[in-house]
C-alpha cells in the first residue's frame, strides 16, 4: 500500500531519513501549510518553494500537492487561486482520525465507522502521536479485509480545477 505524507513546509521539523524513506518506498510527498486568511499568497508560495528545494535535494523529486493545516476553507478565494495558479493541487482531509487526542482503539473505531457510512473517497488525516503507528496498522488491515481500494494521492488524481473546487 502507498500513502501521501503531508510534510510541514517548515523543513526544520523534518527527519531527513524519514523523508528519504517516504520517497524510496514510492509514497507521495506533499506539503502542509500553516496559513490563515491573513497569510500573504506570496509568503505561502515562498514557503512551498523552500520546502520543495529541500525535498528535491533529499529525494530528487518535487511536490505539487498541498493542504492547509486548518483546511482550505481557512484560506480566501484569492489565496487558493494563487496556489492553484502556481500549479499546486489542494487537498483537505475528509476525516481526522482523532489519533492526536484518543488512543488507537478509540481512533480506529471512529475511523472505521466513517468508512462504513460513506461510499466516497476518504482522505484520513493521521497525526504524529503514540497512537498513530498502531492505528495505521489496524486501518491498513481493515482496508485489506474489507476490500477497500487504497492508494496514494497523486498530482493527477482528482485535482483542484478551480479555486472554489477544493478536495
Predicted regions and their residues:
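Terminal accessory/targeting
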Residues: 1-4, 13, 102, 113-167
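Short beta-strands and strand-loop turn motifs
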Residues: 31-33, 63-65, 92-94, 121-126
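Active-site beta->alpha N-cap acidic-glycine motif
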Residues: 1-57, 61-62, 68, 137, ...
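Short aromatic-enriched loop/helix-cap "lid" or pocket-rim segments at secondary-structure transitions
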Residues: 18, 77-79, 164-165
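A mature extracytoplasmic/lumenal domain signature
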Residues: 7-11, 33-35, 70-72, 94-97, ...
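Alpha-helical scaffold elements lining the catalytic groove of polysaccharide deacetylases
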Residues: 36-57, 72-120, 132-138
